[in-house]
């Protein structure tokens, strides 16, 4: 189901949903700054708030994610200089509507797709960066710990790696015969003592682009010591969501729990668009989460 917006013909790529004081906010990828929406009802109309975060001389703001910490709001996103690479940044605000100010670059290397989590053991940052050493080289999921919202501890722990051809982003990307794989868009949550780590795999322009997940039943709050197992169907590729007869490019989502029900907010394109506009737009579906199993009702 598509979300409803009070503006037309706008993309909502990489949608991140956030609830605060009875209102819901959605932060999305955009070229000139992080854009945001708000609503009182996620199934009702969303109001466009405009651009809520920019950094001087930076472009291409990807995959924003927000956390409330000690009564302030911290927005994590990647951006780049015109001829540079994507680097994760953080900015802060006194309101979820922004403006988000005081930007800081967290890493000098290529890093994207943050998800910040607070547990009893502290603040953790899931993100994506590259590993060129393995056979299935490419972008993988990593974990860091934060001493505060602005200060990474540089654990650089790789926590999930590619294992399927469906996770190939581009064949022979570097010209050496090896295929580039991509895992991105990490989203972590815990339900009934099971840790879930959802992600997107592959290339968003390909039919195999999908949402999958890994899980751990370990009774730990220090996330750096968890060992995640990718969900499969007896070792075979088994995504939660992938292209169907209605939508394609299905991926990069966030999750919210409302009245004991889980929902994924994700982006996709229409297989049969009704207009010339067919960019990635935000959609919602229910997730069934139980005993280490996640299924989607689309």
Kindly label every feature range from the protein language model:
Residues 1-298:
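Carbohydrate-active catalytic/glycan-binding domains of CAZyme proteins
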């Amino acid at each position: 189901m598509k979300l409803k917006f009070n503006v037309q013909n706008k993309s909502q790529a990489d949608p991140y949903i956030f609830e605060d004081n009875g209102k819901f906010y959605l932060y999305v990828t955009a070229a000139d700054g992080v854009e945001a929406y708000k609503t009182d009802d996620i199934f009702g109309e969303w109001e466009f708030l405009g651009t809520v975060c920019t950094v001087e001389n930076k472009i291409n703001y990807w995959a924003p994610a927000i956390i409330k910490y000690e009564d302030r709001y911290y927005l994590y996103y990647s951006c780049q200089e015109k001829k540079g690479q994507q680097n994760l940044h953080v900015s802060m605000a006194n309101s979820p509507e922004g403006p988000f100010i005081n930007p800081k670059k967290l890493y000098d290397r290529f890093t994207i797709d943050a998800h910040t989590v607070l547990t009893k053991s502290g603040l953790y940052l899931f993100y994506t960066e590259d590993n060129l050493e393995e056979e299935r080289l490419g972008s993988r999921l990593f974990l860091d710990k934060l001493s505060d919202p602005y200060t990474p501890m540089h654990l650089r722990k790789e926590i999930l790696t590619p294992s399927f051809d469906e996770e190939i982003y581009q064949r022979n990307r570097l010209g050496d015969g090896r295929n580039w794989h991509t895992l991105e868009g990490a989203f972590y949550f815990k339900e009934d003592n099971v840790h879930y780590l959802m992600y997107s795999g592959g290339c968003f322009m390909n039919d195999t682009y999908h949402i999958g997940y890994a899980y751990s039943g370990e009774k730990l709050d220090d996330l750096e010591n968890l060992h995640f197992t990718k969900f499969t169907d007896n070792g075979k590729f088994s995504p939660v969501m992938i292209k169907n007869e209605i939508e394609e490019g299905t991926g990069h989502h966030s999750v919210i729990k409302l009245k004991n029900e889980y929902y994924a907010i994700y982006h996709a394109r229409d297989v049969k668009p009704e207009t010339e506009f067919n960019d990635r737009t935000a959609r919602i579906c229910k997730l069934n989460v139980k005993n280490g199993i996640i299924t989607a009702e689309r």
